[in-house]
Amino acid sequence: MPAKMHSNYPSDSETAELRDSTESGYVSGGSSEEYLPEIVFTKPHLQFLNRQLQFLEPQDVLRWCVTSLPHLYQTTAFGLTGLVIMDMLSKLSIPRPQMVNLIFLDTLHHFPETLKLVDNVRKRYPLQHIHVYKPQGVETEEEFAKKHGERLWEKDDQLYDWIAKVEPAQRAYRELNVHAVLTGRRRSQGGKRGDLDIIEVDEAGLIKINPLANWTFDQVKQYVKENDIPYNELLDKGYKSVGDYHSTSPVKENEDERSGRWKGQAKTECGIHNPRSKYAQYLMDMERKRQEEALSQALQNKLTTA
């Protein structure tokens, strides 16, 4: 039976209901009809697509995505690979049934150079709309610290990732009705990305496409140089991969591209591309408990007034 993917990214409580019927990013035919997809993949179909797409140039992968996947967006922190994807999209010479807009997660802890780059990208690609999502209920780093505590990333990094990145991403997917996203992940970045497929389906049913999965860091840099693409000034100061200022360091020439992220820690991903975090599981459990208590109270009230 074909595997079904949600047409909307579910909320935390909704994901809890779907979790038991989900395996390796696929939702069984018994899951809620509320999330009937516009696209249906079987597992063999997804495997077939990856075998075919891995031999295509990134521009051809993007061309396939734009013409085949509805509600397609690009998620980016404006790293080099994301900038290359953006430039390639702007140059596709095909009738485009949809614009591929950007989703940028402003954690409120980016380097000033990163925010300057966002402005430069807007000027260079004026037709490209950037949807900016911030941690819920705050607009500045000071407000974030006041609400969640100083240096939260040191006290509870999973909670920080959830508040600053994962929840805003999931909120963006729901509000924008995202079905598929382009990411800047590549195999040469190492870590968990070493065996990356071109196209994936995450455990919530979101399609993720990694068009430059086969490219090296040098190939990405060369494209940026040849096409005069604006990039983060920190890359000229020893950085290769840039995230939040508190978890990003310069790297040596022989070090891996992402070795400057969370240096000295076993951590390699911020949570957006990981399975749902323990904190997310905690939130779902708390929501389930709240609903059970509300139901129990409602029944008690009904018995009292009967």
Curated annotation (Swiss-Prot):
Coiled coil: none annotated. Pathway: Sulfur metabolism; hydrogen sulfide biosynthesis; sulfite from sulfate: step 3/3. Keywords: Amino-acid biosynthesis, Cysteine biosynthesis, Methionine biosynthesis, NADP, Oxidoreductase. One of its GO terms (biological process) is cysteine biosynthetic process. Residues 1-30, 245-266 are annotated as: Disordered. The keyword Phosphoprotein does not apply. PANTHER family: PHOSPHOADENOSINE PHOSPHOSULFATE REDUCTASE. This is Phosphoadenosine phosphosulfate reductase.
